[in-house]
A protein has these predicted regions:
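Extreme N-terminal starter segment of soluble prokaryotic enzymes
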Residues: 1-5
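N-terminal strand-loop element at the rim of the active site
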Residues: 9-15, 29-71, 165-166
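Conserved alpha-helical elements of sugar-nucleotide-dependent glycosyltransferases
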Residues: 18-26, 76, 144
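A generic structural motif
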Residues: 33-39, 93-94, 120-121
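A short, charged, and often flexible helix/loop element on the N-terminal side
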Residues: 56-82, 134-141
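An aromatic- and histidine-rich active-site surface loop
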Residues: 74-85, 95-128
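Membrane-proximal helix-turn-helix segments that form the acceptor-binding/catalytic region
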Residues: 141-161
Length: 166
């Protein structure tokens, strides 16, 4: 059985946007496929309980989203990645695929890729366009996004793009 860990969406069931709808539909369409087991990181507020639940036959694990402003998505992705690495180790999962949606954690990424590789896994990334080009970000934030994207593209095993423009 192929274990696929999905990090970077707010979670399922979908109630936010594109990535969440993608993950919701992916797990729905494959819920009876006994050759794939999905594990999905789901964000919960800091005051909520963590734990696991099953949705569309996917194992969903709750990761607390810290209230630290704009950086909360970065910390959430790192916390989900830590959880995933520990879960793979604890359960002796061989050849896991860790699929990361968006390029938020580039400066921290290589360390986790090495850990996943040492456990026999692969890391796939969906870059989600060029976040660093968006007008809403200040110059320092744009620099971070550009660096982050470059590092994640460099260290991933496979890029999965859903747009020709990417």
């Amino acid at each position: 059985m192929q274990n696929v860990f999905i990090i970077g969406s707010k979670g399922i069931p979908a109630s936010y946007g594109g990535y969440e709808t993608f993950v919701d539909k992916l797990t729905e369409y494959h819920q009876t496929n006994d050759k794939i087991k999905y594990h999905v990181a789901c964000a919960v507020d800091d005051n909520k309980e963590v734990g696991e639940f099953i949705y569309h036959n996917a194992q969903c694990f709750k990761i607390k989203r810290k209230k630290i402003g704009p950086a909360q998505a970065i910390v959430y992705d790192i916390d989900a990645l830590k959880y995933t690495v520990n879960y793979i180790k604890k359960n002796n999962i061989d050849k896991a695929i860790v699929y990361i949606l968006a390029c938020r954690i580039g400066p921290f990424f290589k360390r986790y890729v090495k850990q996943i590789h040492s456990l026999g896994g692969k890391v796939y990334v969906n870059p989600d366009g060029h976040e660093w080009k968006r007008a809403k970000w200040s110059a320092p934030v744009k620099m971070y996004w550009k660096l982050s994207e470059r590092l994640m593209v460099k260290h991933s095993d496979l890029l999965i793009c859903d747009s020709k423009n990417i």
